């Protein structure tokens, strides 16, 4: 019998089994600790995704931006092309996906994202499915929000914002912040939560990035420094250095002390620079740029932390200017991610210094992998730092919630409508007055509950001030006239000053009913519900063109420390319903012509002598008799 020829289809021959059993599965390659090849696997809800399909992968990570990823694969990888469009693939929209990069038998990096977009492209009967998505930070883009934070650190604000989101999807890390001090007043105004965090990172010089698993705020770096050797994984690298002006002065104004503050770049103490290329660029910059310009720094400036803010701003600005180097490279190491430190070594094993990854793109086509990265020297302040970034805000109304300024500066605290839900309010803010100065000025402070119009210095939502007060539909003055005739000051207690242009009058009233009226026709009427007192340190003069009338319901008392003179141009009449008494040490009556005394009875009495004298005659007349009596003698001459 002829031997069976295996070339023509023998089955299960031991030689064949031994030969083909040696072929390894994909899982075997993933577990191979000696393989430098990079493999990519995907999982959704704990299950493998596109396990048996070819796909291309790209994901992009950049500091202070949303990370993104794109997968493209054949449309029939998920959908039956004879079925409805995206019949199965559409169910993956909004799902959380895990992208794993394997090398040397282990997962070197996992990127977790959310599928946010599906695109099915059909052409010539074939389809291509593009699956794109974002890091979980995209959840922070749920709509515009307005709120404020008072006396909180940057870390506390960050935790307050992210606490509203599921921790199993959006994990956060805060570590080694560049800004440690308490922030007096921080505003999120018509911004998404992510836009707000981005702005804080830019303004306060903080690294904000997603490392594939967590949203990181601060100067955190990876658990180890990743070496990239030019002879192993570093494909190519470029180094760029430049010069920038290094000298500057910041000037600001402190509201509470009423003084200007200055700090220059020489006052800032920074970390030691160990990168020799950076040191060269720094020295060259100082040789090129000599002028020290003076710039206005516009801090929050609403409390006594202004100098601390200025000090921090100068330090961060100086470090920003000393960032004179950027490195761009391409590598095959899949463990690189943003926020990591990488140490570069050239082909001759010479170190090319250590750098922080601030941007990286990963590419995998199913067969090969590489990444392209951007890095800078390891500095505390990121390259996008800008201390002149702030939330823009337009003028708007608010309600006064406190006016008892602890520093007696005439400030108030107000609450905007968007602060009411969380019972937030501004710190003490100033208000515009017609005139002000030390111990003088115009002191009109709005009452608690009153509506005011608030402006913002330079449009900065964190620098509000009161422009003035105004009425609304439910709170009117009560002084409206069709001719706009009335100008009035009316205080909380009921004190009024009313100027009436129609009448030409001025009316002043207090809560007790005391009034002062100038009627516009030459008349003044003063009314006191109780007492009226006039005091003068020297003289009081009263003049009337015609008559002066004084009336009292009971008594009128006049007193003079020395002389009391009353003069009448014609007649002087004094009437008393009861008795009339004149009391004085001496009384002298002088008439240029006649003195007439008329009464029922007239009695003259002296303790000593009575003398009657005349230059001519003395006549005594009586209708009846004249009696002259004396206790002793009577003499007539």
Give, region by region, the residue ranges found by the protein language model.
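Amphipathic alpha-helical and helix-coil boundary elements used as assembly
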Residues: 1-637
């Amino acid at each position: 019998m002829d031997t069976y020829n295996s070339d023509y289809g023998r089955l299960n021959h031991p030689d064949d089994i031994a030969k083909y059993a040696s072929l390894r599965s994909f899982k075997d390659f993933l577990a191979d600790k000696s393989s430098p090849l990079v493999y990519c696997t995907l999982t959704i809800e704990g299950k493998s995704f596109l396990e048996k399909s070819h796909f291309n992968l790209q994901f992009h990570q950049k500091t202070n931006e949303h990370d993104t990823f794109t997968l493209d694969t054949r449309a029939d990888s998920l959908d039956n092309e004879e079925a409805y469009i995206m019949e199965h693939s559409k169910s993956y929209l909004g799902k959380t996906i895990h992208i794993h990069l394997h090398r040397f038998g282990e997962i070197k990096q996992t990127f977790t994202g959310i599928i946010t977009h599906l695109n099915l492209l059909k052409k010539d009967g074939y389809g291509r499915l593009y699956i794109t998505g974002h890091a979980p930070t995209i959840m922070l883009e749920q709509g515009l929000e307005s709120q404020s934070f008072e006396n909180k650190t940057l870390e506390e604000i960050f935790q307050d914002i992210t606490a509203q989101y599921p921790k199993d999807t959006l994990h956060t890390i805060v570590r080694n912040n560049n800004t440690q001090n308490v922030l007096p007043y921080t505003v999120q105004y018509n911004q998404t939560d992510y836009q707000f965090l981005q702005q804080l990172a830019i303004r306060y010089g903080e690294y904000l990035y997603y490392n594939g698993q967590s949203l990181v705020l601060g100067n955190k770096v990876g658990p180890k420094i990743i070496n990239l050797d030019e002879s192993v994984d570093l494909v190519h690298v470029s180094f760029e250095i430049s010069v920038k002006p290094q000298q500057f002065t910041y000037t600001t104004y402190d509201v509470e002390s009423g003084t200007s503050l200055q700090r220059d770049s020489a006052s800032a103490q920074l970390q030691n620079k160990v990168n020799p290329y950076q040191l060269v660029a720094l020295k060259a910059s100082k040789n090129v740029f000599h002028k020290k310009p003076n710039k206005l720094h516009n801090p929050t400036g609403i409390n006594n932390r202004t100098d601390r803010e200025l000090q921090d701003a100068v330090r961060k600005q100086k470090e920003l200017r000393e960032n004179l180097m950027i490195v761009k490279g391409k590598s095959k190491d899949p463990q690189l991610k943003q926020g990591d430190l990488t140490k570069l070594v050239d082909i001759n094993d010479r170190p090319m210094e250590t750098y922080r990854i601030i941007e990286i793109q990963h590419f995998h086509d199913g067969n090969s992998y590489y990444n392209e990265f951007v890095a800078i020297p390891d500095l505390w302040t990121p390259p996008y730092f800008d201390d002149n970034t702030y939330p823009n805000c337009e003028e708007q109304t608010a309600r006064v919630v406190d006016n008892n300024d602890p520093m007696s500066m005439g400030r108030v605290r107000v609450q905007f409508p968007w602060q009411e839900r969380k019972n937030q309010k501004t710190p003490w803010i100033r208000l515009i007055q017609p005139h002000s100065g030390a111990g003088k000025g115009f002191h009109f402070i709005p009452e608690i509950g009153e509506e005011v119009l608030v402006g913002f210095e330079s449009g900065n939502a964190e620098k509000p001030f009161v422009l003035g007060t105004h009425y609304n539909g439910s709170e009117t003055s009560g002084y409206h006239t069709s001719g706009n005739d009335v100008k009035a000051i009316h205080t909380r207690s009921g004190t009024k000053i009313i100027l009436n242009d129609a009448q030409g009058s001025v009316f002043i009233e207090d809560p007790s009913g005391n009034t002062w009226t100038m009627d516009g026709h030459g008349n003044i009427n003063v009314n006191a519900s109780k007492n009226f007192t006039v005091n003068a340190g020297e003289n009081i003069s009263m003049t009337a063109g015609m008559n002066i009338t004084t009336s009292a319901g009971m008594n009128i008392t006049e007193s003079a420390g020395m002389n009391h003179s009353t003069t009448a141009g014609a007649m002087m009449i004094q009437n008393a319903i009861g008795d009339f008494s004149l009391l004085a040490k001496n009384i002298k009556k002088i008439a240029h012509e006649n003195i007439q005394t008329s009464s029922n009875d007239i009695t003259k009495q002296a303790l000593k002598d009575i003398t009657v004298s005349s230059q001519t005659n003395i006549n005594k007349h009586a209708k009846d008799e004249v009696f002259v009596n004396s206790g002793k003698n009577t003499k007539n001459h």
